[in-house]
Amino acid sequence: MQLVLAGKYIGAGLASIGLVGAGIGIAIVFAALINGVSRNPALKGQLFTYSILGFALSEATGLFALMIAFLLLYAV
């Protein structure tokens, strides 16, 4: 029983590593937004729209990793 519980915790910890990738992806998206607006301030609205879309896609991958971690902890 203890081995199964340890496996759950290790698996959930490894699954939550995907959150690091989501954080890095979000940082890259907003760094590109700042870079793009500083180069061409006239495109601020369009670049902001694209960056929100990129943020949502990056955050979705992180939420999927979090969902898998919770499933490993509580559903299995």
UniProtKB/Swiss-Prot annotation:
One of its GO terms (biological process) is proton motive force-driven ATP synthesis. GO terms for molecular function: lipid binding; proton transmembrane transporter activity. The modification N-formylmethionine is found at M1. The record marks E59 as: Reversibly protonated during proton transport. It is a multi-pass membrane protein. SUPFAM superfamilies: F1F0 ATP synthase subunit C. It comes from the Eukaryota. InterPro entries: ATP_synth_F0_csu, ATP_synth_F0_csu_DDCD_BS, ATP_synth_F0_csu_sf, ATPase_proteolipid_c-like_dom, F/V-ATP_Csub_sf. Signal peptide: none annotated. The chain crosses the membrane at residues 14-34, 52-72. Keywords: ATP synthesis, CF(0), Formylation, Hydrogen ion transport, Ion transport, Lipid-binding, Membrane, Mitochondrion, Mitochondrion inner membrane, Transmembrane, Transmembrane helix, Transport. It is found in: Mitochondrion inner membrane. One of its GO terms (cellular component) is proton-transporting two-sector ATPase complex, proton-transporting domain. The keyword NADP does not apply. F-type ATP synthases have 2 components, the catalytic core F(1) and the membrane-embedded component F(0), linked together by a central stalk and a peripheral stalk. The central stalk, also called rotor shaft, is often seen as part of F(1). The peripheral stalk is seen as part of F(0). F(0) contains the membrane channel next to the rotor. F-type ATP synthases form dimers but each monomer functions independently in ATP generation. Mitochondrial membrane ATP synthase (F(1)F(0) ATP synthase or Complex V) produces ATP from ADP in the presence of a proton gradient across the membrane which is generated by electron transport complexes of the respiratory chain. F-type ATP synthases consist of two structural domains, F(1) - containing the extramembraneous catalytic core, and F(0) - containing the membrane proton channel, linked together by a central stalk and a peripheral stalk. Belongs to the ATPase C chain family. This is ATP synthase subunit 9, mitochondrial. It comes from Yarrowia lipolytica (strain CLIB 122 / E 150) (Yeast).
